Amino acid sequence: MENIETILRLAEDKILLVQNLKALQEYKVEFLGKNGIVTGELKKLGSLNEQERKEFGLKINKLKDKIQNIIKAKAEILEEQELNFKLAADKIDLTIPARRYKQGSIHPITQCSEELIQVFSQFGFTIENGPNIENDFYNFTALNFEDDHPARQMHDTFYLKSQENNKPLLLRTHTSTVQIRAMKNGKPPFRFIAPGRTYRSDSDMTHTPMFHQIEGLVMDKNINMGHLKYVITTFIKSFFENSNIELRFRPSFFPFTEPSSEVDIRMNKNDKWLEVLGCGMVHPNVLKNVGIDSSEYQGFAFGLGVERFAMLKYNIKDLRQFFEGDMRWLKHYNFGSFDIPNLAGGLTK
């Protein structure tokens, strides 16, 4: 009995003075391990009679439980101390400037495209899409291009080696191809825009081999040039956020519209006129090619270059800069990720 009390006091004295978990584990082995002090006391049971074994065994088990509880309590204290020490060591200094968070930005072409689309959404336009690789019918024939039209030549159009019905495929030169597909596959009335990439064999300060267009089509009964002028005028003033902007509809020629017009604008009276888009009433031959009766339905179409509008609105001088990937230029002209327009105005994609 005295030996058991001595062992308990010894365990308490040693364990209470422990400063770390490693030393605590060593004392646990010393007292409760296979060759520990308490285990040594258990070995004495073999020399005792049955009654003594029962009493002594009960005391040893109580000793073992008390030492385990002491160790457990000390372990909790040491673990809390170590956690507090670690937290103090890892403390964040809130006065230190934060690292700059790297994030993407919106390219001016994307920004301009979304702004243009948002404006057209106010007129109830929907979006139609089509393939970048087209055949001769959708890109030229259905749009009333003559067989010898210069636009069909290889110096203007990218032709592919692949063929369809013994005729070469090509990269579309305008998104008017989308209008043809939509009219052939649907029934009027129509009111949609067709944004997308287009391709022409040209490269200088104002032309690139690949560029972005948005073309639009409105078709219904009794549509006339007055509707066309209203939509274009309202669109231009809304996009450039200038109600005083001047527009000039200048007679022109396009195979797929008749009459045709090119639209010039100037921000102020003293500015030079700038050409921004082409438009006109859909040619009866185009309607015939897609199976629509031109005596019942009329429509107008328009087409604009996204890069051209971006250059005018954001004051960008050289078209080629859009595609050079100069990080300094992009840092200056790109838009924040949250600046992109909200398309909740009713547009459907």
From Swiss-Prot:
Cofactor binding note of this UniProt entry: Binds 2 magnesium ions per tetramer.
Cited Pfam families: Phe_tRNA-synt_N, tRNA-synt_2d
Record SUPFAM superfamilies: Class II aaRS and biotin synthetases, tRNA-binding arm
Swiss-Prot/TrEMBL GO biological process terms: phenylalanyl-tRNA aminoacylation
GO molecular function list: ATP binding; magnesium ion binding; phenylalanine-tRNA ligase activity; tRNA binding
Entry's Gene Ontology cellular component terms: cytoplasm
Subcellular location: Cytoplasm
This protein's UniProt keywords: Aminoacyl-tRNA synthetase, ATP-binding, Cytoplasm, Ligase, Magnesium, Metal-binding, Nucleotide-binding, Protein biosynthesis
InterPro entries to which the protein is assigned, alphabetical: aa-tRNA-synth_II, aa-tRNA-synth_II/BPL/LPL, Phe-tRNA-synth_IIc_asu, Phe-tRNA_ligase_II_N, Phe_tRNA_ligase_alpha1_bac, Phenylalanyl-tRNA_Synthase, tRNA-bd_arm
EC number: 6.1.1.20
Catalyzed reaction equations: tRNA(Phe) + L-phenylalanine + ATP = L-phenylalanyl-tRNA(Phe) + AMP + diphosphate + H(+)
Complex formation: Tetramer of two alpha and two beta subunits.
Family of this protein: Belongs to the class-II aminoacyl-tRNA synthetase family. Phe-tRNA synthetase alpha subunit type 1 subfamily.
Name of the featured protein: Phenylalanine--tRNA ligase alpha subunit
Classification of source organism: Bacteria, Pseudomonadati, Pseudomonadota, Alphaproteobacteria, Rickettsiales
Gene that produces this protein: pheS
